[in-house]
Amino acid sequence: MNDKKHLGHQAKKRFGQNFLHNDAVISDIVDAINPEPGENLIEIGPGLGALTEPVIERAGKLSVVELDRDLAHRLRHHPFLAKDLTIYETDALKFDFSELATEEQPLRIFGNLPYNISTPLIFHLLTFKDKVKDMHFMLQKEVVERMAAGPHCKAYGRLSIMTQYQCQVFPVMEIGPEAFKPAPKVDSAIVRLIPHAHIENPVKDINALNTVCLAAFNQRRKTIRNTFKKLITEAQLAELNIDANLRPENLSLDEYKKLADFIVDNPPEAAPVKEKRRMAKNKMTEPANNNLNENSAPEVD
């Protein structure tokens, strides 16, 4: 028996395809999304339509973003769903979701995301947060834990800070491997993200916040003093009421915001060329992501 084949489609590892097939789990996920007629609903990675069909039954229409041309073809020729679908056959990592939003109809985005690109895809989607009402995603359980984590725990990192700065994070439910075909080697979870209507004390530059977090959690066992010694002095840290002896996982979101604003106000012009190049590279580079088909490894997020 081919465990990687479901409803006549061979799961493709390069797309991180693991298809939901448990009806009870599917029903619970759709209940959590709570789609209604007239809403601007977008599904990422509809696959074989496990969520697509019940969402259309409730909402009446749906836009989907699907990279796999075989699956996009199936949806275009689906005898019941095709007439209610708008299909974008493209890479969600490159898709401009703002094109689908209007002032009257902010986006409601959901999907069983490919776990091997989940982190960069979340960061990409957050760039459209002003156009989004909410998002519901199936992710690796460990990723949801990191998104929701607070200071003083191992799961806390860049993903926690950058997500919580921009959204409310609500873990919704956990799902075991047996709900999928082929079954992944990790547990999964649903998370609800609701962009903040107003960010209190916003940072001067969100890219600076991202850069500070990358620098900190790439060296999470170092103290803040040692991590940022080329960018800020211990006396300056004290002026910001930040304990230089703390490690990155012990700083709050507000303290990272202070560090980011300090870097903006005091650009590291005097930093060695090598250090400046490292920071520039960190700004643009995403760390390795989770792989649904393998046991996860520690990450800098």
UniProtKB/Swiss-Prot annotation:
Region (Disordered), start-end ranges: 267-301
Reactions this protein catalyses: adenosine(1518)/adenosine(1519) in 16S rRNA + 4 S-adenosyl-L-methionine = N(6)-dimethyladenosine(1518)/N(6)-dimethyladenosine(1519) in 16S rRNA + 4 S-adenosyl-L-homocysteine + 4 H(+)
Subcellular location per the Swiss-Prot or TrEMBL entry: Cytoplasm
Swiss-Prot/TrEMBL keywords: Cytoplasm, Methyltransferase, RNA-binding, rRNA processing, S-adenosyl-L-methionine, Transferase
Residue numbers binding S-adenosyl-L-methionine: N18, L20, G45, E66, D91, N112
Class of this enzyme: transferase
Record's compositionally biased regions (Polar residues): 287-301
GO CC entries: cytosol
Name of one Pfam family that matches: RrnaAD
Gene3D superfamilies linked to this entry: Ribosomal RNA adenine dimethylase-like, domain 2 (1.10.8.100), Vaccinia Virus protein VP39 (3.40.50.150)
Enzyme Commission (EC) number: 2.1.1.182
GO molecular function terms attached to this record: 16S rRNA (adenine(1518)-N(6)/adenine(1519)-N(6))-dimethyltransferase activity; RNA binding
Record-stated family: Belongs to the class I-like SAM-binding methyltransferase superfamily. rRNA adenine N(6)-methyltransferase family. RsmA subfamily.
Function: Specifically dimethylates two adjacent adenosines (A1518 and A1519) in the loop of a conserved hairpin near the 3'-end of 16S rRNA in the 30S particle. May play a critical role in biogenesis of 30S subunits.
PANTHER family linked to this entry: DIMETHYLADENOSINE TRANSFERASE (PTHR11727), DIMETHYLADENOSINE TRANSFERASE-RELATED (PTHR11727:SF7)
Protein name listed in UniProt: Ribosomal RNA small subunit methyltransferase A
Species whose genome carries this gene: Colwellia psychrerythraea (strain 34H / ATCC BAA-681) (Vibrio psychroerythus)
